[in-house]
From Swiss-Prot, chain A:
Lipidation (S-geranylgeranyl cysteine): 211, 213
UniProt entry tagged with the keyword Repressor: no
Family the entry assigns: Belongs to the small GTPase superfamily. Rab family.
A Pfam family it matches: Ras
Keyword terms, alphabetized: Acetylation, Cell membrane, Endosome, GTP-binding, Hydrolase, Lipoprotein, Magnesium, Membrane, Metal-binding, Methylation, Nucleotide-binding, Phosphoprotein, Prenylation, Protein transport, Transport
Endoplasmic reticulum listed as a keyword: no
Organism phylogeny: Eukaryota, Metazoa, Chordata, Craniata, Vertebrata
Role noted for this protein: The small GTPases Rab are key regulators of intracellular membrane trafficking, from the formation of transport vesicles to their fusion with membranes. Rabs cycle between an inactive GDP-bound form and an active GTP-bound form that is able to recruit to membranes different set of downstream effectors directly responsible for vesicle formation, movement, tethering and fusion. RAB4B mediates endosomal tethering and fusion through the interaction with RUFY1 and RAB14. Acts as a regulator of platelet alpha-granule release during activation and aggregation of platelets.
Obligatory cofactor(s): Mg(2+)
CDD domains xref list: Rab4
Modified positions (N-acetylalanine) in chain numbering: 2
GO biological process annotation, one example: regulation of endocytosis
This protein's name: Ras-related protein Rab-4B
Length: 213, 585
């Protein structure tokens, strides 16, 4: 039960409805395609410990609902996310067109420094493609995103997407660009002792005051 | 304790006030407070005491000091108690709205915990006038409905039938709903046909899908196909008004053309759906020949719109008002195009177009419907596909009902989660009209939980108060962990009436109790089920010192593993607890 890891990163999976967010997460966690996936309501959840550049990192991944109507709800989960997979469906231009709005949400609500990787999912459906690789990579470049085309069905590039994002965050920590200590950085140190450090503080608060007056 | 406190209260308040006319012993105690010397003998070093403390302990009568301390302690306790009582009474006033004050017990008359059985139900059906509605509901509340008769009982619980209706009245209710369903189905299917037609023209060949955004053609295509809000920017090409192809040659799946005649006069006109055509990128015409008439059409339509498809219950007015009646709103072409003067010939063609368009829908409506159909299709396909009932034909029925409901509520539109709520109804009732009617009834309550409905925040606030009153230990823990007083971990619970938290068989059992509870114990029974879920795992939550994230994760993982009957039992007990609390105030 007890996991040891050096860091914990909070990740988001965001993007329009039906782009395969839950399937990407499921593929990453379980290494298989989720056949009977239902649309996500509220938020779903997954975590996995990965090894990146000699460090063990626990990814705590929040999988969100896609329909815009739920955006106000989804937003409450954004806070303190270190990384995000921004997902669109390569066979649906509509999902590609709304990327900018999702990105704005992520940068304003999670953190301006959030590390985002753009994922053009459903790569296996190439004959039905509506968005070219070139067009999307241009968008990624303009918005300073990493970019991969993925397939939750075959598993192609799924692991890479998560790992790439994690690696970038680690690099930014190493270079000092990201400060894990800052509130809402979405990064926590993994050792259990640190988590317990938080407890005595609240214990002190309820301890009786020394003076009765 | 209370009487003692209140008799002493005068003194306490005086002490807290520290007015200028203090008696001598008060002054002395004030002195001791001012220098905080009560602890100086124990806290600071003995050498420091005389110099820093003005009141040397041995000069003060020890008894007086103790007295003062005692009073202060009692005062603090009293004020704490008073605040707590005030808080409690506020919460009680608040909570009293959550439950029915009259307690209906399971054991009087006995047997309610056995549930509503087939026997009882057949007795009721033979003698519906003399059976007490409340008695039946009480049995449902305490024991559920026998599976075999759910199909018959649910329409009563949901309000499609009323208890005490005669057979004839029930038939009347059925035929009214059947007629309405048939009409609505015809209405939106006619509209769907136009939407599909429009889509076909917007995407004539697969390769035109690649739009770089640079050419006007693709720009137009994008506007037509994707944009659901800016209807005034949609271009219409007059030159595309060719006679429609016969349906047989179309490559798409056959449209339900035969349905068209079934609708009321307003929809029958949709048989001329093909008249609305849009510029397509491969029309081969220079884009200069496109001109915008949409705004003109729009405004004419708005004027000619007095006749809508009002429902008898007034539920669908917003949604259906977009439909254009076949009135001659366009008998005179309006000066809609800014380029009128220079394009006389086109205006002529425009007049022709307008004449044909009388029978059509507003662009806005078409866009909205297209968007909703798209969303519904996406979700219906993946709705409960691991449950045996949802074979492709049954999914198609689910879609028809869903679209019909959405057509009548286009102002809200389809929201994810609606499918989840409809699916169990269809499974039990296995009848399209009935499921449609019952779903409409169910949504009267449930629609408020959806975004912008406002009920969700109220649920969260109520949960907070309930936990505070019924489980203060857990409340303290939650309070310490800060974040999850927002109770977002209950979001899905409330949105879907626990549908995703439970196995299908348990969903049936829980839902009918929720519906019956409304008349028996609480209109907000869902709150108590939510609370029961929290309580069922309270030790785990407490012992692991779970925070918001842990709790969301925990309950996501526990989904479909709950013991529904146990949860219901706890929930009923919690209602009873609150009822007792209120009674004993």
């Amino acid at each position: 039960m007890a996991e040891t890891y050096d860091f914990l990163f909070k990740f988001l999976v965001i993007g329009s409805a039906g782009t395969g967010k839950s399937c990407l997460l499921h593929q990453f966690i379980e290494n298989k395609f989720k056949q009977d996936s239902n649309h996500t309501i509220g938020v779903e959840f997954g975590s996995r410990v990965v090894n990146v550049g000699g460090k063990t990192v626990k990814l705590q991944i929040w999988d969100t609902a896609g329909q815009e109507r739920f955006r106000s709800v989804t937003r409450s989960y954004y806070r303190g996310a270190a990384g995000a997979l921004l997902v669109y469906d390569i066979t649906s231009r509509e999902t590609y067109n709304s990327l900018a709005a999702w990105l704005t949400d992520a940068r304003t609500l999670a953190s301006p420094n959030i590390v985002v990787i753009l994922c053009g999912n459903k790569k296996d459906l190439d004959p039905e493609r509506e968005v070219t690789f070139l067009e999307a990579s241009r968008f990624a470049q303009e918005n300073e995103l990493m970019f991969l085309e993925t397939s939750a069905l075959t598993g192609e590039n799924v692991e890479e997407a998560f790992l790439k994002c994690a690696r970038t965050i680690l690099n930014k920590i190493d270079s000092g660009e990201l400060d894990p200590e800052r509130m809402g950085s979405g990064i926590q140190y993994g050792d259990a002792s640190l988590r317990q450090l938080r407890q005595p503080r609240s214990a002190q608060a309820v301890a009786p005051q020394p003076c009765g007056c | 304790m209370a009487p003692f406190l209140s008799s002493d209260a005068g003194d306490m308040i005086e002490m807290q006030g520290f007015g200028p006319s203090l008696p001598a012993w008060h002054l002395e105690s004030l002195c001791s407070q001012g220098s905080s010397c009560l602890f100086c003998s124990t806290r600071s070093s003995p050498y420091a005491t005389p110099s820093r403390c003005s009141c040397v302990p041995d000069r003060l009568p020890l008894r007086l000091l103790c007295e003062s301390m005692k009073r202060q302690i009692v005062a603090r306790a009293f004020y704490g108690w008073l605040a707590y009582c005030r808080h409690l009474s506020t919460v009680r006033t608040h909570l009293s709205a959550l439950v029915r004050h009259h307690i209906i017990p399971p054991a009087r008359p006995p047997g309610a915990s056995g549930g509503l059985t087939k026997d009882v139900w057949s007795k009721y059906q033979k003698d519906e006038k003399n059976y007490k509605e409340l008695e039946l509901l009480r049995q449902v509340y305490y024991g559920g409905v026998e599976h075999e008769i759910r199909k018959d009982v649910w329409p009563f619980l949901l309000g499609h039938y009323k208890f005490g209706m005669s057979k004839k009245e029930m038939e009347q209710a059925d035929s009214a709903v059947a007629a309405r369903y048939k009409r609505v189905l015809a209405e939106w299917k006619a509209c769907e046909a136009v939407v599909r037609q429009r889509e076909r023209e917007a995407q004539p060949a697969p390769f035109t899908k690649f739009s770089s955004g640079s050419s006007i053609d693709s720009h137009v295509q994008r506007l037509v196909h994707r944009d659901s809000t800016i209807s005034n920017d949609v271009f219409i090409s007059v030159d595309d008004l060719e006679p429609p192809e016969p349906p047989g040659t179309e490559d798409c799946r056959p449209e339900p053309e035969q349905e068209l005649g079934a609708g009321p006069p307003g929809t029958a006109v949709a048989g001329r759906q093909q008249s609305v055509e849009f510029d397509s990128p491969d029309s081969g015409l220079p884009s200069s020949r496109n001109y915008s008439v949409t705004s003109g059409i729009q405004s004419s339509i708005d004027e000619g719109q007095s006749m809508g498809f009002e429902e008898e219950d007034g539920g669908g007015e917003e949604g259906s008002s977009g439909l254009v009646p076949a009135a001659g709103a366009f008998s005179e072409p309006r000066d809609a195009s800014p380029h009128k003067a220079s394009r006389a010939s086109e205006l002529e063609a425009g007049a022709e177009l307008v004449a044909v368009c009388t029978a059509a829908y507003t662009i806005e409506l078409l866009d909205t419907m297209a968007l909703n159909l798209h969303r519904i299709d996406k979700d219906v396909q993946r709705c409960d596909r691991n449950y045996w009932y949802f074979t492709p034909p049954n999914l198609e029925r689910l879609r028809d009902i869903m679209c019909s409901y959405v057509w009548e509520h286009l102002d809200v539109g389809y929201v994810q989660g609606m499918c989840d709520l409809l699916a169990p109804l269809l499974v039990i009732l296995d009848n399209d009209q009935l499921a449609y009617s019952c779903f409409s009834h169910l949504m009267k309550r449930m629609s408020q939980n959806f975004p912008n409905g406002g009920a969700m925040d109220t649920h969260f606030a109520n949960m907070r108060s309930l936990i505070q009153i019924l489980d203060s230990e857990l409340f303290e823990l939650m309070h310490q962990n800060g974040d999850y007083t927002h109770f977002y971990f209950c979001y899905r619970w409330f949105l879907l009436d626990f549908k995703r938290e439970l196995l299908y068989e348990d969903v049936f059992a829980v839902w009918e109790v929720i519906w019956a509870a409304r008349h028996i114990s609480s209109e907000h029974f869902v709150l108590f089920i939510a609370l029961a879920l929290v309580e069922a795992y309270r030790e785990i939550i407490r012992d692991n010192n779970m925070d918001f994230t842990d709790i969301i994760k925990f309950f996501n993982e526990r989904a479909e593993h709950h013991d529904a009957q146990e949860i219901l039992q706890i929930a009923r007990e919690l209602v009873h607890k609150v009822q007792m609390l209120i009674e004993n105030k």
